[in-house]
Regions:
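Positively charged n-region of N-terminal signal peptides that target proteins for export
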Residues: 1-5
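General N-terminal leader/first-domain-start detector
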Residues: 20-81
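Exposed alpha-helical structural elements
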Residues: 18, 26-30, 107-108, 202, ...
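Long, compositionally biased interface segments
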Residues: 195-245
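Generic low-polarity alpha-helical segments
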Residues: 15-22, 42, 55, 145, ...
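Aromatic-patch recognition
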Residues: 61, 66-198
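Bacterial N-terminal signal peptides
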Residues: 7-17
Length: 245
């Protein structure tokens, strides 16, 4: 393969008129074949266009497409520009800068990476009874801790939704439509049981024999940093502590 690519690079410096017709045809076929590997990713329908003024973003974090990997329909694709429409729970793919995204069929998406983080489709991995949408893997050990960010477009007057769009997101009080951010958490135990998580005690109670040690460890950390942990921080820290023992 390396020799083939080197030959193609050398030939590319020659005028087309000096290349045999057969060589030109072979080169075109070679590049078509190389590009065809990811063509299936771009066959979906166009991403939904939100033709309104709104605060916040419908995306998982921001509107930037980031390069990642995706396992789609049983095949792994590398270095693909991806983003997530969190309002519709759709994985978007783009094949060129300036072009709108295409939607990947969720039933064929097993997992993907975005911004260095791993995301999974629980229904593709565990069946239709699992929670729908995409979930970010916050801790990947014997017990997994996952997070789902969802967005909902809501009416917004007098700045009442300002604190519900996420940190560092621009806000204009003259706009009366806002994408409100919501976050859900769950754990998947070593036995494969999926448990929704709404409180710190739910995580701690997963390990009844170690609750006292967990409490002491967390108190020591919170004293050191002089603040209480968020639910997300707490879940990751508890699982790290338990699995390190």
């Amino acid at each position: 393969m390396k020799t083939r690519i080197l030959i193609l690079l050398l030939l590319s410096f020659l005028p087309a008129s000096l290349l045999p017709a057969q060589a030109q045809g072979d080169d075109e076929a070679f590049f078509r074949q190389a590009a065809a590997g990811s063509c299936i990713l771009y066959r979906g329908h166009q991403a939904y266009a939100y033709h309104i003024h709104y605060n916040g973003t419908y995306c998982w974090s921001d509107a930037e497409f980031k390069t990642g990997d995706v396992r789609y329909n049983g095949k792994l694709y590398h270095d693909i520009p991806l983003n997530v429409d969190a309002a519709r729970q759709e994985l978007l793919v783009r094949n060129a800068v300036g072009q709108g995204g295409k939607v990947l069929s969720r039933e064929f998406v097993e997992w993907f990476t975005l911004g260095g983080q791993r995301f999974v489709n629980l229904q593709a991995l565990s069946g239709p009874k699992a929670p729908a949408g995409y979930w970010e893997v916050l801790f990947d050990g014997k017990t997994q801790f996952l997070r789902q960010v969802s967005k909902k477009l809501m009416k917004d007057y007098n700045g009442e939704k300002r604190q519900m769009i996420g940190e560092g997101v621009p806000y204009d009080s003259r706009i009366h439509e806002t994408f409100v951010r919501d976050v859900a958490y769950c754990v998947i135990t070593e036995a494969g049981e999926l448990i929704p998580v709404r409180s710190k005690s739910q995580i701690r109670n997963l390990f009844p024999a170690q609750r006292k040690e967990i409490r002491r460890h967390i108190v020591a950390l919170e004293d050191r940093f002089n603040r209480s942990m968020t639910l997300e921080e707490y879940g990751v820290e508890v699982l790290k502590f338990v699995e390190a023992r």
